[in-house]
């Protein structure tokens, strides 16, 4: 069962103005381009070097992927998980957002992959809503303790 507007406002009071009937809108803050290789071998993470694009207007080149962070930290309460879905305006503009699961107990700044699949540049302004987080209860879960915890 997905969590609705009233409970979302109680669970995530810092996001009250972004709560929708079935989720929480999240806004883009910083956008980065990849500047070199990365790897994941035998569970060893070597993230690629990044270069931050100059805000407040981000220009996404056709066929390119970018890492985007949201404008504030989030804390997912124990017993709940988040899934992140792209805003339909981006999809209608040939821009996809690739995401992961937000585990119970995660606290930190979320990052997503933006990919301009179109033939033309796409312009995105800092502060625009790019994803909607939907929240589900999770029974019998532990708490996130991975390397991206802040």
Curated annotation (Swiss-Prot):
It holds the Pfam family DCD. It catalyses: dUTP + H2O = dUMP + diphosphate + H(+). GO terms for biological process: dUMP biosynthetic process; dUTP biosynthetic process. Disulfide bonds: none annotated. InterPro entries: dCTP_deaminase, dUTPase-like_sf, dUTPase_archaeal, dUTPase_trimeric. Its EC number is 3.6.1.23. Keywords: Hydrolase, Nucleotide metabolism. GO terms for molecular function: dCTP deaminase activity; dUTP diphosphatase activity. Coiled coil: none annotated. Pathway: Pyrimidine metabolism; dUMP biosynthesis; dUMP from dCTP (dUTP route): step 2/2. PANTHER family: DCTP DEAMINASE, DEOXYURIDINE 5'-TRIPHOSPHATE NUCLEOTIDOHYDROLASE. This enzyme is involved in nucleotide metabolism: it produces dUMP, the immediate precursor of thymidine nucleotides and it decreases the intracellular concentration of dUTP so that uracil cannot be incorporated into DNA. Belongs to the dCTP deaminase family. Archaeal dUTPase subfamily. This is Probable deoxyuridine 5'-triphosphate nucleotidohydrolase. It comes from Methanothermobacter thermautotrophicus (strain ATCC 29096 / DSM 1053 / JCM 10044 / NBRC 100330 / Delta H). The gene is dut.
